[in-house]
From Swiss-Prot:
Reaction catalysed by this enzyme: a purine D-ribonucleoside + phosphate = a purine nucleobase + alpha-D-ribose 1-phosphate; adenosine + phosphate = alpha-D-ribose 1-phosphate + adenine; cytidine + phosphate = cytosine + alpha-D-ribose 1-phosphate; guanosine + phosphate = alpha-D-ribose 1-phosphate + guanine
InterPro entries in alphabetical order: Ppnp (IPR009664), RmlC-like_jellyroll (IPR014710), RmlC_Cupin_sf (IPR011051)
PANTHER family in UniProt: PYRIMIDINE/PURINE NUCLEOSIDE PHOSPHORYLASE, PYRIMIDINE_PURINE NUCLEOSIDE PHOSPHORYLASE
GO CC terms, sorted: cytosol
Functional description taken from the UniProt entry: Catalyzes the phosphorolysis of diverse nucleosides, yielding D-ribose 1-phosphate and the respective free bases. Can use uridine, adenosine, guanosine, cytidine, thymidine, inosine and xanthosine as substrates. Also catalyzes the reverse reactions.
One annotated GO molecular function: purine-nucleoside phosphorylase activity
Family named by the database record: Belongs to the nucleoside phosphorylase PpnP family.
TM stretches of this protein: none
Family matches, as Gene3D superfamilies: Jelly Rolls
Keywords carried by this UniProt record: Glycosyltransferase, Transferase
Protein name per UniProt: Pyrimidine/purine nucleoside phosphorylase
Length: 103
């Protein structure tokens, strides 16, 4: 799916890491929340409160997931899961366009 229908979008962007990651929160009619955004080339560590599925729409990165000894490479069209109350490190090699699915 290349677009979401019938959603509410927060006008103000979520800006993290001095602008290296910018996203917008969206809410579906059933209350489901997601964020859509971009991460510019950088190495960043994110914390989670809820479980997340990071869907890469486009881009190229290496991700070190909780408990992993080495990073795993992901490209557009792939996704990875992150447990609640954890951290992951992402090394963006080519700007990543993503959808973050919560819960």
């Amino acid at each position: 799916m290349s677009k979401f229908e019938n959603v509410s979008v927060a006008k103000k962007a979520n800006v993290y890491f001095d602008g290296a990651c910018v996203s917008h929160s969206i809410e579906f009619p059933d209350g489901t929340a997601k964020s859509v955004g971009v991460i510019l080339p950088a190495t960043l560590t994110f914390g989670t409160t809820a479980p997340e599925v990071m869907e890469l729409v486009e881009g190229h990165c290496r991700v070190t997931l909780p408990g992993a000894d080495a990073p795993v490479t992901f490209r557009g069209g792939e996704s990875f899961e992150v447990p609640a109350d954890s951290e992951f490190t992402i090394e963006v090699l080519e700007t990543v366009h993503y959808v973050c699915h919560y819960g």
